[in-house]
């Protein structure tokens, strides 16, 4: 109830101020099933924008620094966000992600780990592919285009969802390659070979 209220309230202003234009809504799975939102990260407003237009609640993985302020941290927690330590393999965050997906909910991740202005696929580790395969979840690549300036247009593209074959045992290097390919899909690149 709280999430829905905030979604509608903040969503109204986000759509109004940034004139959000959405493409590919037909690519969003209709069924209430396990799903990972995987997006590029340009601004702290990215999760707000995606959440404002997405029909289901998204449980965002967010940098732990945001939770240091008790007021902000409490608000984010109430919205379903949870902290991740980007400097190490955060097992607690991984376990939280697995629980969210096993409960047939939607997990939101920015695999680049921080806001970026230039693409560098080599920074993408195996995490998203590993979590997706372990939970047999679909991945929905999402691309945000534009600058967050008043009355400038922001465009959101929902790409076609993909799923990793859970029956195949991949090496860590292969999982990294898959994760990097998923980010290529986010940016609209055509993948000529696939491991999934």
PLM regions: where:
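Short, basic, glycine/proline-bearing loop/turn elements
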Residues: 10, 78-84, 111-114
